[in-house]
Amino acid sequence: MEIERINEDTIKFYISYLDLEERGFNQEDVWYDREKSEELFWDMMDELKYEEEFSPEGPLWIQVQALKHGLEVFVTKATIGGKGEDGFDVTLSSPDELAEEKIEKLLEENFNPVKKESLGEDDTLEFILEFRDFEDVISLSRATGLENLLTKLYSYQGKYYLNVEFPENKYDESNIDNAVSILLEYGLESNLTGYMLAEYGKVIFDVPALQQVRKHF
């Protein structure tokens, strides 16, 4: 199992399906058996104690993502009074549902009617995509339907991240739905923010990043 510190409040685990089986669990346990999934979670947190200074006390947000060869588990300390105030909020997404759920969540959070009434014309929806390697970035740059996206490419802690911006005066829900669907074919949605990447990451290509990647590679 791999453990990565994302920031002060977030830890990312990666556990292969082989490692999962060696620990006495299977994929169905994670998706359909809450008791088993919580048992696996606390096993991972016990191992974390020896790797990182991260206290699991208090409310937590937990997100599990299914990859081809294993699982990514993000654990974030929740702010009291926020979504995690009940103390244990687990989000599990199967491989077939993951992309659709992410798109729906992104649109619901940023384009619900109540929120739009208070937004100005210059408001922008931000989406951060994480890549395993640069070849995936090159492949994405050649995809059709993304030619006009506002994108900036960063490197941070050995990985590549694409900051995609959707100005609300230029994109409607359908446009964003289509674009995000394509983006998620080449990478994973990241928990990092554009602010964090701008502060700690290294800019590889400024806007428009995908066009520049396609031009040079």
Swiss-Prot record:
Sequence intervals crossing the membrane: none
Function per UniProt: Enables the recognition and targeting of unfolded and aggregated proteins to the ClpC protease or to other proteins involved in proteolysis.
NCBIfam families for the chain: PRK02315.1-5 (NF002644)
Organism in which the protein naturally occurs: Listeria welshimeri serovar 6b (strain ATCC 35897 / DSM 20650 / CCUG 15529 / CIP 8149 / NCTC 11857 / SLCC 5334 / V8)
Molecular function per GO: protein-macromolecule adaptor activity
Protein name: Adapter protein MecA
Source taxon at top rank: Bacteria
PANTHER family, per the entry: ADAPTER PROTEIN MECA (PTHR39161), ADAPTER PROTEIN MECA 1 (PTHR39161:SF1)
Any one Pfam family match given in the protein's UniProt record, by short name: MecA
InterPro entries, alphabetized: MecA_C_sf (IPR038471), Neg-reg_MecA (IPR008681)
Family: Belongs to the MecA family.
Domains as described in the record: The N-terminal domain probably binds unfolded/aggregated proteins; the C-terminal domain interacts with ClpC.
Subunit record text: Homodimer.
Gene name of the record: mecA
